[in-house]
């Protein structure tokens, strides 16, 4: 990001990495929010944001963004997105 602070693929990857290790989730949310603002129909970015929201304890937002990720995937929904949606749906009853 230092070399190209506008590279949203790198932003998404960093946000995802921070989320996976559970470190600095607020920074992960901030980076991920930028990606969905720039590409609001990108299912990968929506999935990342939804999962971060889940990790932050915001089930309502998590479901909203994960549902959008599925909707924007068309017929080829990635298994990871489906898995995230099912996990959040199960945990956030």
What are these regions (language model features)?
Residues 57-63:
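Short cationic/low-complexity microdomains
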Residues 21-24, 59, 87-93:
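Alpha-helical linker/edge segments of TPR/alpha-solenoid repeat scaffolds
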